[in-house]
């Protein structure tokens, strides 16, 4: 198999292809030769300036082929009806059998993305994985994914795994954009992979699990552009959720502390983001304050769906406290009694929560509710949770509705690391445009979720017990029928006596 061309030779080849097609680098191939998402099939010619509009070109979502219904779990666990479905806002929870692990999830989602876009494997120059599902303390998931690039001869691929609870995917996305806007960029695309298996021991936390992976193709001239200079970040040392027991998949969780940490990080990230965007506006002659009115859609890391509704309400409270008295009285009806409070005094105030949820309900329905479809029906995907929300948002709106909008995003990982950032959506929603094709690519999300097999709580519990039994077991082949997997799914075929893992793929 031909080795990857050297960078200088590659750029010459790109120029020759462009010339033969009578195209400049700024244009696309003829319609008959276009890849999905209108992505050029060859690497981009590098220039001396920053590439324009770096962001998400294509997106792929993977989740397991089986789920347990939360109403069934409520009955099985002998809790009151609505504890999970209303209290947590969860309807179904996807889960993996012992045939799937973090490597197989990421293999599946990357191969699906590459096959759908028909992008040459040597067009990828960076691949980074965000995950907290650690099955080896040394060997990265990224090294396993390199198996997919073997036939292309492409071994010149930067990036490695990034880990900090649910934040690793966002760090990987930022790293990809930073690489592309640096002197180290060689003109090729970046792949960002986020994936996790969220499992808990039997008890109150188990219904907040889930599993899945998201792969994103990053490049210039994207339909979802990362807004430059607009990241508000907060990091601190906290033991709200952590995994010190390396012999178990299960975390240690301080639930109340974790919610407080999440909300505190949200407050501080939002303040930092507002400060930066207002500075940009001020330099452009605009002295208006930034509020949620300047964001058409808002997505969040989603440990459970009810948390997201509280988080949007929290952002409204930030806007309320920073606004003038006139605006507080006119724009934020029902919140007047709380204008003397400080943010840090309200994390456990149920009266504030109740008033905020009521005041922000219409905004939640317009800006955020559609983004929770995957989380509601599949559960918490940890690092990929935020980007599953992005896919859900795209799947529930037309390209015309999304065009020109700003999508705010809040990413949180316990321990803790958090960022508030934003995407600017392309204004071009015409048929065949990158935006229209990106939206179209995730339009089957509801249909795919409905195609999964419903498992009983007893079957779910048995599989959780199997995962405990086989965790770090050697010299075995996982039990199960591979025909129960979705077509094209990679699975763990065997673990040998030296812990080496072998994978196979179910035929498409």
Curated annotation (Swiss-Prot):
State where the protein is found. Answer: Mitochondrion
- Residue numbers of N6-acetyllysine PTMs: 83, 118, 243, 256, 306, 310, 327, 342, 350, 354, 358, 427, 437, 447, 473
InterPro entries per UniProt: HMG_CoA_synt_AS, HMG_CoA_synt_C_dom, HMG_CoA_synth_N, HMG_CoA_synthase_euk, Thiolase-like
Q: Which SUPFAM superfamilies match?
A: Thiolase-like
The catalytic activity of this protein is classed by the Enzyme Commission as: 2.3.3.10
| Location of the active site | 132, 166, 301
Q: What PTM annotation applies here?
A: Succinylated. Desuccinylated by SIRT5. Succinylation, at least at Lys-83 and Lys-310, inhibits the enzymatic activity.
Q: In which pathway does it act?
A: Metabolic intermediate biosynthesis; (R)-mevalonate biosynthesis; (R)-mevalonate from acetyl-CoA: step 2/3
The answer to whether UniProt assigns keyword Nucleus to this entry is: no
Q: Where is the transit peptide?
A: 1-37
Which UniProt keywords are present, listed alphabetically?
Answer: Acetylation, Cholesterol biosynthesis, Cholesterol metabolism, Lipid biosynthesis, Lipid metabolism, Mitochondrion, Phosphoprotein, Steroid biosynthesis, Steroid metabolism, Sterol biosynthesis, Sterol metabolism, Transferase, Transit peptide
Can you supply a Gene Ontology BP term from the record? response to cAMP
According to UniProt, the reaction catalysed is: acetoacetyl-CoA + acetyl-CoA + H2O = (3S)-3-hydroxy-3-methylglutaryl-CoA + CoA + H(+)
- Tissue localization of expression: Liver and kidney.
* Residues noted as binding (3S)-3-hydroxy-3-methylglutaryl-CoA in the record, renumbered to the chain: 80-81, 166, 204, 208, 258, 301, 310, 380, 414
For molecular function, the Gene Ontology terms on record are: hydroxymethylglutaryl-CoA synthase activity; identical protein binding
Please tell me which top-level EC class this enzyme sits in. Answer: transferase
Q: Which family does it belong to?
A: Belongs to the thiolase-like superfamily. HMG-CoA synthase family.
Quaternary structure, from the entry: Homodimer.
What does the function comment of this entry state?
A: Catalyzes the first irreversible step in ketogenesis, condensing acetyl-CoA to acetoacetyl-CoA to form HMG-CoA, which is converted by HMG-CoA reductase (HMGCR) into mevalonate.
**Name used for this protein in its record:** Hydroxymethylglutaryl-CoA synthase, mitochondrial
Top-down, what is the taxonomic lineage of the species of origin? Answer: Eukaryota, Metazoa, Chordata, Craniata, Vertebrata
Instruction: Report the gene name.
Output: Hmgcs2
């Amino acid at each position: 198999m031909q080795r990857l061309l050297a960078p200088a030779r590659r750029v010459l080849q790109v120029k020759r292809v462009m010339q033969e097609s009578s195209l400049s680098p700024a244009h696309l191939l003829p319609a008959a030769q276009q890849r999905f998402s209108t992505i050029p099939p060859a690497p981009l010619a590098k220039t001396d300036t920053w590439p324009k509009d770096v962001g998400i070109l294509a997106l792929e979502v993977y989740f397991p082929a089986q789920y347990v219904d939360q109403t069934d779990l409520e009955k099985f666990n002998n809790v009151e009806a609505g504890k999970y479905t209303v209290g947590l806002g969860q309807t179904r929870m996807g889960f993996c059998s012992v045939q799937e692990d973090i490597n197989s999830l990421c293999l599946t989602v990357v191969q699906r993305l590459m096959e759908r876009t028909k992008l040459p494997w040597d067009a990828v120059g960076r691949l980074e994985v965000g995950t907290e599902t650690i099955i080896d303390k040394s060997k990265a998931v990224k090294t396993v994914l390199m198996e997919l690039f073997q036939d292309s001869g492409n071994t010149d691929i930067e990036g490695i795994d990034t880990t900090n609870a649910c934040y690793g995917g966002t760090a990987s996305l930022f790293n990809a954009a930073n690489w592309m806007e640096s002197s180290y960029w060689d003109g090729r695309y970046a792949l960002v992979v986020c994936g996790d298996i969220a499992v808990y021991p039997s008890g109150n936390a188990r219904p907040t699990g889930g599993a899945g992976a998201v792969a994103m193709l990053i490049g210039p001239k994207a339909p979802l552009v990362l807004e430059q200079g607009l990241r508000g970040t907060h990091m601190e040392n906290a033991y709200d959720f952590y995994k010190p027991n390396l012999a178990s998949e299960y975390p240690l969780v301080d639930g109340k502390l974790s919610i407080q940490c999440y909300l505190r990080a949200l407050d501080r990230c939002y303040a930092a983001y507002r400060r930066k965007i207002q500075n940009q506006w001020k330099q452009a002659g605009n002295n208006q304050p930034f509020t949620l009115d300047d964001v058409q859609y808002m997505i969040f890391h989603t440990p459970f769906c009810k948390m997201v509704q509280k988080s949007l309400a929290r952002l409204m409270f930030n806007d309320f406290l920073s606004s003038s008295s006139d605006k507080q009285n006119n724009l934020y009806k029902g919140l007047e009694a709380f204008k003397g409070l400080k943010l840090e005094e309200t994390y456990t105030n149920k009266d504030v929560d109740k008033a905020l949820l009521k005041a922000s309900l219409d905004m939640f329905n317009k800006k955020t509710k559609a983004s929770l479809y995957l989380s509601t029906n599949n559960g918490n995907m940890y690092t990929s949770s935020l980007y599953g929300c992005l896919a859900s948002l795209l799947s529930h709106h037309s390209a015309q509705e999304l065009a020109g909008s700003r999508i705010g995003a809040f990413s949180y990982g316990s321990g803790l690391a958090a960022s508030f950032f934003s995407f600017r959506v392309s204004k071009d929603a015409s048929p065949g445009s990158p935006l229209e094709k990106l939206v179209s690519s995730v339009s089957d999300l509801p249909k795919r979720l409905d195609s999964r097999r419903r498992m009983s709580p007893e079957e779910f519990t048995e599989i959780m017990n199997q995962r405990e039994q086989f965790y770090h077991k050697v010299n075995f082949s996982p039990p199960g029928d591979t025909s129960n997997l979705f077509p094209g799914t990679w699975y763990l075929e065997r673990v040998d006596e030296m812990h080496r893992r072998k994978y196979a793929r179910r035929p498409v």
